[in-house]
């Protein structure tokens, strides 16, 4: 997960909230000693996706089309086939599965949306874990809880005590934990593939055509000169291809940044207060989130790169420009949190796309032009558990088994 929520109790205006999240921290001592080594573009996360679907011909027609091969789309595809194995399901991914937010997250698992609890949302963590169990997915899920940390009114016996524009301490503990995002993407894709859904990589859907005169299959997915007819569709592209879901004026895409440290010793982990395995995120600004890894490295994340258009996301190189500046500031912040991190090395630097709606709520609704199309996304960086949970809900809604929520 790439957490960007300030607090479930806060109600920051849109402009103030995003501005404060993208600001760096001034006045920090020291200079960065890391020699950043990463591929151009978004860099490289610690996760490995070890499943690739076999190439296959594009179908002429499917009962259910899923646009987007991340957590949401893959979970929905697998669940539709589980409940209705007689229905054909096609997943159409513009690049490779997990190429967007799902493969570039921090892997933090929380039970609420970035807007807090929502009417009728239900037990996200229980539903997430239950879905993984039913689909046979192993992703190193651990749910020990999560630390909310802040600079005011922290616990006197806080296990965390870091220096970061004040003294960062634990202020609360909430339900949550961590997962291996690469294993989660791979597991969902395997489950969908095993169930009989067809997964097509490099299949960018350019447009949707709503033509009611076509009778049984009024919906047409356009991919260049290729047309794919569908009975229903789920648009799960999150921060990309916003026009498909009609979201270009309803939500804003950004690139969030993170680093992973080299493996630390158990003693260093204990000094940092992270030996419980609980992930953490701040409830005030400047924002910071993170978690430990199986390698005993630690992920730290902060900073948002703004774009005017979602197409600009792929043009970002975290080794240059604004992204590189924010990445350098993040490294310095990490090194100044505690003396045990002063000379720490980094193994990974990366960015991941997120989509933030203006009310910070997930977008989960019918397309404005057709109730045969569901649009789902905009988790504001808090989508690891939520995307799978709501992907399952979307599958049930497409089958007519469940109504969509009213989160307007």
Give short role names for the model-derived ranges:
Residues 75, 208-293:
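Flavin-dependent oxidoreductases
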Residues 99-120:
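Glycine-rich active-site loop/strand segments that organize a redox cofactor
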Residues 64-90:
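N-terminal Rossmann-like FAD-binding beta1-loop-alpha1 element of flavoenzymes
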Residues 10-14, 29-38, 126-190, 194-196, ...:
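Flavin (FAD/FMN) cofactor-binding and adjacent substrate-gating region
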Residues 263-268, 312-349:
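Flavin-binding catalytic cores
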Residues 331-408:
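C-terminal catalytic lobe of FAD-dependent flavoproteins
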Residues 83-104:
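Glycine-rich FAD pyrophosphate-binding loop
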């Amino acid at each position: 997960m790439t957490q960007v929520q300030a607090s479930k109790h806060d109600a920051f205006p849109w402009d103030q909230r995003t501005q404060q999240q993208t600001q760096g921290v001034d006045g920090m001592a020291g200079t960065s000693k890391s020699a950043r080594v990463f591929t151009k573009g978004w860099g490289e996360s610690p996760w490995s996706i070890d499943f690739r679907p076999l190439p296959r011909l594009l179908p002429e027609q499917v009962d259910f089309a899923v646009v987007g091969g991340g957590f949401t789309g893959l979970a929905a595809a697998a669940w539709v086939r589980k409940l209705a194995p007689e229905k054909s399901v096609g997943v159409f991914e513009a690049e490779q599965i997990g190429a967007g937010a799902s493969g570039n997250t921090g892997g933090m698992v929380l039970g609420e949306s970035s807007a807090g609890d929502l009417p009728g949302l239900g037990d996200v963590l229980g539903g997430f874990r239950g879905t993984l169990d039913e689909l046979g997915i192993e992703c190193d899920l651990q749910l020990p809880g999560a630390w909310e940390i802040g600079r005011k009114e922290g616990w006197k016996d806080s296990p965390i005590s870091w220096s970061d524009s004040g003294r960062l301490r634990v202020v609360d503990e909430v339900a949550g934990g961590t997962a291996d995002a690469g294993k989660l993407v791979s597991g969902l894709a395997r489950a969908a593939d095993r169930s009989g859904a067809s997964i097509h990589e490099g299949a960018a859907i350019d447009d949707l055509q709503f033509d009611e005169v076509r009778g049984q299959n009024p919906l047409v997915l356009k991919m260049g000169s290729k047309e794919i007819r569908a009975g229903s569709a789920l648009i799960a592209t999150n921060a990309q291809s916003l026009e498909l879901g009609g979201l270009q004026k309803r939500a804003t895409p950004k690139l969030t940044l993170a680093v992973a440290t080299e493996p630390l010793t158990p003693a260093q982990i204990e000094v940092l207060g992270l030996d419980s395995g609980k992930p953490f995120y701040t409830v005030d600004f400047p924002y910071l989130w993170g978690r430990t890894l199986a390698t005993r490295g630690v992920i730290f994340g902060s900073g948002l790169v703004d774009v005017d258009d979602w197409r600009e996301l792929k043009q970002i190189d975290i080794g240059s420009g604004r992204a590189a500046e924010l990445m350098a500031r993040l490294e310095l912040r990490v090194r100044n949190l505690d003396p045990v991190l002063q000379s720490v090395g980094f193994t990974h630097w990366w960015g991941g796309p997120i989509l933030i709606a203006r009310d910070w709520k997930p977008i989960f609704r019918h397309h404005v032009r057709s109730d045969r199309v569901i649009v789902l996304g905009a988790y504001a960086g808090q989508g690891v558990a939520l995307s799978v949970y709501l992907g399952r809900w979307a599958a049930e809604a497409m089958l007519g088994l469940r109504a969509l929520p009213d989160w307007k």
